[in-house]
Amino acid sequence: MQVESTLFSHPKYWAECFGTAPFLPMSRKEMEKLGWDSCDIIIVTGDAYVDHPSFGMAVIGRMLEAQGYRVGIIAQPDWSSKDAFMQLGRPNLFFGVTAGNMDSMINRYTADRRIRSDDAYTPGDVGGKRPDRAVTVYTQRCKEAFKDVPVIIGGIEASLRRIAHYDYWSDKVRRSVIFDAKADILMYGNAERPLAEVARRLAAGEAIADIQDVRGTAVIRKEPMPEWRGMDSRKIDQLHKIDPIPNPYGADDVGCANLSGPSDAKIFDNDAPKPISVQPPRPKPWDKTYVLLPAFEKVSEDKYLYAHASRILHQEQNPGCARALFQPHGDRGVWVNPPAWPLNTDEMDAVFDLPYKRVPHPAYGKEKIPAYDMIKTSINIMRGCFGGCSFCSITEHEGRIIQSRSQESIIKEIKDIQDKVPGFTGVISDLGGPTANMYRLGCTSEKAEKTCRRLSCVYPSICGHLGTDHKHTIDLYRAARAVPGIKKILIASGVRYDLAIEDPAYVKELVQHHVGGYLKIAPEHTEEGPLSKMMKPGMGAYDKFKELFDKFSKEAGKEQFLIPYFISAHPGTTDEDMLNLALWLKERKFKLDQVQNFYPSPMANATTIYHTELNSLKNVKHTSEVVPVPKKGRQRRLHKALLRYHDPAGWPIIREGLIAMGREDLIGNSPNHLVPPEGRNERGPKWMKDANQGQKALTRFSGNQFDERKGKGDAKGKPSASKPKGPKSGANAPQSQQPKTSRPGAKAPFGQSGFKGKAEQGKAGQNKAGHQGRAGKASSGRQQAK
């Protein structure tokens, strides 16, 4: 999508005369050293301040600084009073509030709603340094400190709560966060462009209440914007115009007298002069058009209307054709403008070339910040994801259009890391983004790109308009390897294997030069039921990628392994589906550690399915498919235990589940059994203590699994990143089995009320190759959540 470069093209604010700050100030003392008497803009964030382009406050702060503004940072303030929010004084223009790179609720709670004791974005990995629903709390404190100062909220937390949304932690539908926070403007997505425009207009003296038409923003209004045409979508199966359709030629003087037609004299008067007239272009169906969504009060009570509203929102994410949205909340409503135009390559380069120090603020001393340690030698080469995985919110935050940096800018950053990162060893830990292999990929049809409303460019099959040539990525990898002093370039971002197999040359380049012993990919499941609700491909694509991976590893003389990621308890998953996945894992001797139950994050399509138990991936009707959803704690524990079938802590609940499914034949001591029978001492105090602890998680996978493939079941340790032990991935791997799970008298899904009905026939190994999107998790630290 061709976008004009406007981000840095406007005249700078007068305060540019103060120059560039070594670090954006966090105290009055730092401000005084810079010669500042005040800040123009103050950013309040739930993360520690790290001056690095993977941290949102740094990107936004440096971008605004480049526009000439004096920007201060209040990081992880004490929210118990307004005092910490006054430490930099009153900002001249506005407060910018963000929860940080992660949603504060996901940051503070596990998928089982248990509070976390750690926080990777806090010095010392200490938990509890940010409040629940940080955007709301911080905004209220800013308003308390300086009532008349505008507050603009943004980042991943605000972005994914821009309309009424299901909240997993309170198990109810909540209002748009702009109402709870009482903010003046909400910005969604990567907000450089809308934030620069709003700052410029505020600096010019425009009132915050008058700035309501900026793309990529949401505001509170009593009614829709004037002169916008409305589409009423408050009911299912009903869509009609709210206002009369305007004359497409712009004429406003067509009355009844003019509709009778011209006289015969005018028709046959061929000698009469005919002036040439130029008609205005016919407006597009989405130009100045909004969709009226069901009200908050309605979607809170009616799950069909909630699914319907969610479906509309996800179809209005293409900047080229998106319509505005208006959702009533009582006597007011939230007006969501169309998404901001994506940054072009020049603008992306300019943002990432800003003068970042690439280290934490000196105020933290020598304290470790785990999130920084993880990404300090990684490089973000792009934004966006067109995969559309239903459990992921990156598409709703960053968009489907891939925004790529130039190769020159990326190589410059590699050299910057060499100069600025203390203790750099010559290894770049990642060249990636939400997905590793979408760099400079996109739609080959400009018209299709501007008008498409598909949820995914690769599901259920790869779109014919999508370019799949990885030439630019291959060229980038080679150029990066050629930088003097660089020993290794690793690819740690998730690889879209269904996309990669379209270009075997890319797979070869990746496998032979950029895999540090094992490569992480995410099939997420093996069964069609959950895969169809995840919008993920069948295992045929995984098998084909694995075949290429093994082939190219062998050609390079390397022993390398694929590390598959899986999700348990995802909407659409039955107990039988999880059993078949467990059997697939056991057959291949995979032993997973640190497995993840499905986590319903706000605005994700899968979260809508979780809440409504309806298939919102298709048009919502009163006859929409009802989806099985593992919600009960016991059933979710069973699904998680099946992923770790090898852990004695889960054997009791697995046995109960197998009996409920009529699969007692899988309980025994032979290699063909899933779990052993209950032992004599199993319920003793010592065993229960050990079982509750589970097996120690060395990596995402058990340390001895690779040695077991050689028959060394007692071997210890994890595979080395540079030279893992064990055979080549997939050596002598048996074909997917097809276990029988249907037998007379089999019981209902485990964890539901009562045991009745029949178990479904197993489907392991029956999935066909498909094409589906792979997006990183919404909580990913790589995400540019500003």
Curated annotation (Swiss-Prot):
Coiled coil ranges: none
Region described as Disordered: 669-688, 698-786
GO MF term set: 4 iron, 4 sulfur cluster binding; catalytic activity; iron ion binding
SUPFAM superfamilies: Radical SAM enzymes
UniProt signal peptide: none
Biased composition (Polar residues): 732-741
Pfam families: DUF3362, Radical_SAM, Radical_SAM_N
Keywords: 4Fe-4S, Iron, Iron-sulfur, Metal-binding, S-adenosyl-L-methionine
PROSITE patterns reported in the protein's UniProt record: RADICAL_SAM
Organism superkingdom: Bacteria
Cofactor: binding comment: Binds 1 [4Fe-4S] cluster. The cluster is coordinated with 3 cysteines and an exchangeable S-adenosyl-L-methionine.
Composition bias type Basic and acidic residues, residue spans: 679-688, 706-717
Sequence similarity: Belongs to the UPF0313 family.
Protein name per UniProt: UPF0313 protein SO_0311
